[in-house]
Amino acid sequence: MTKKAIIPAGTSKPIAPFVPGSMADGVLYVSGTLPFDKDNNVVHVGDATAQTRHVLEAIKSVVETAGGTLDDVTFNMIMIRDWADYAKVNEVYAEYFAGEKPARYCIQCGLVKPEALIEIASIAHIG
């Protein structure tokens, strides 16, 4: 197995020992992605719609850096802080995955920073 770290330009320094993406034999694993700026501050505090868009743009950047597109994403794991944001998350999500939808699950849970309303991890098959 060949494994390669995928780190888009301008990515914030991880707050733990991990990389934004790891590619192994054509499968890209995108780490849990939070609505952080380059300095690991939460962006769009209190706005689930904007945080979801920020997270999906970051995931798109990882996938594109690996040579793929969001059409290559086959699975998403979504974690939201408040179930009341579920409809807002789905509205933005549908914009990014307009064609063939990936499998996914969504759970409500606490996240690493209290201002973060969403985290998404993804799997994509590229190539």
From Swiss-Prot:
Reaction catalyzed: (Z)-3-aminoacrylate + H2O + H(+) = 3-oxopropanoate + NH4(+)
Presence of the UniProt keyword Chloroplast in the record: no
Single GO molecular function: deaminase activity
Record-level GO BP terms: nitrogen utilization; uracil catabolic process
SUPFAM superfamilies named in the record: YjgF-like (SSF55298)
Keywords: Hydrolase
EC code(s) of this entry: 3.5.-.-
Domain of life, per lineage: Bacteria
Enzyme class: hydrolase
Gene Ontology annotations for the cellular component aspect, listed alphabetically: cytosol
A Pfam family reported for this protein in Swiss-Prot or TrEMBL: Ribonuc_L-PSP
Classification via HAMAP family: RutC
Primary role: Involved in pyrimidine catabolism. Catalyzes the deamination of 3-aminoacrylate to malonic semialdehyde, a reaction that can also occur spontaneously. RutC may facilitate the reaction and modulate the metabolic fitness, rather than catalyzing essential functions.
Family label: Belongs to the RutC family.
Listed name of the protein: 3-aminoacrylate deaminase RutC
Native organism taxonomy: Bacteria, Pseudomonadati, Pseudomonadota, Gammaproteobacteria, Pseudomonadales
